[in-house]
Amino acid sequence: MATASPVTDVDVRHDYLLRLGDDALVLGQRLSEWCGHGPVLEVDISLANLALDLIGQATLLLNEAGDGDRLAFHRDVLDFRNCLLVEQPNGDFAQTIARHLLYTTWQYLLLQRLTQSRDKFLSEFAHKAVKEVAYHRELASDWTIRLGDGTEESTRRVAEGLDWNWRFVPELFEVDETLQVAIDHGIAPDPREFEDEYRSAVAAVLSEARLETPAEQRPILGGRRGHHSEHLGHLLAVMQFLPRTYPDATW
């Protein structure tokens, strides 16, 4: 009987680059959907800038993993390794902010530790990206507080956004065999080590916003293994349409 091939350092590094790159790419594409649709001009511009930061991060990571354009535009849904949280629909503005708070709080804590990676590229990337993500986290926190401590409707909407996205948080701290090898080799930080700090940081924002921490729900996992929701398929159909329709086009 054939045995599975052992996971190599090259495989682990490539997979980790895809995880981080796909997170940034998918969330950047999601936020770009707000362009021209923000509740006010200032917010519209802010969300577009967040999207540009994330697409920039994705470009660096996917180009390091291989041909960035091909990885972004010519992979199928099952080949993407992003977490499920970032592919969730924008919903209304409050739901978008809730999703961004939950993701960027995790991303910020991860990048802080990734600066100590033994991998030179990842360490240098983290030193640059953590400054951008600090702003993302601040914006998401500020808007969560404004919405939560605002009108009855804004409070309801952001609470519903948190409830919707909360089930996807446990996946951020899941460690599978591939990630464990990356941790053991000093490539990636162990997310379990900052889960308590993450939950405390989110709880502090929610307390200031006069919001309750959502009740624990059955976690939904699988994004890191290519098991995605239908929402990612719809997103990729839009994002990949031109490159797949005209694969040899140049402009």
Predicted regions and their residues:
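Internal, conserved structured core segments that host functional sites
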Residues: 85-142
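Acidic/His metal-coordination segments adjacent to aromatic residues that form catalytic metal sites
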Residues: 2-16, 74-100, 147-151, 165-188
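Helix-loop segments that flank and shape redox-cofactor active sites
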Residues: 27-49, 107-122
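A contiguous pocket-lining binding segment that forms or flanks enzyme active sites
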Residues: 121-185
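Conserved alpha-helical segments that form or flank metal/cofactor-binding pockets of metalloenzymes
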Residues: 51-77, 141-144
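Amphipathic, well-ordered alpha-helical segments in soluble domains
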Residues: 23-31, 57, 61, 103-110, ...
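Extended, helix-rich structural scaffolds rather than catalytic motifs
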Residues: 156-251
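Alpha-helical scaffold segments that form or flank carboxylate-/histidine-based iron centers
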Residues: 13-17, 38-57, 96, 121-133
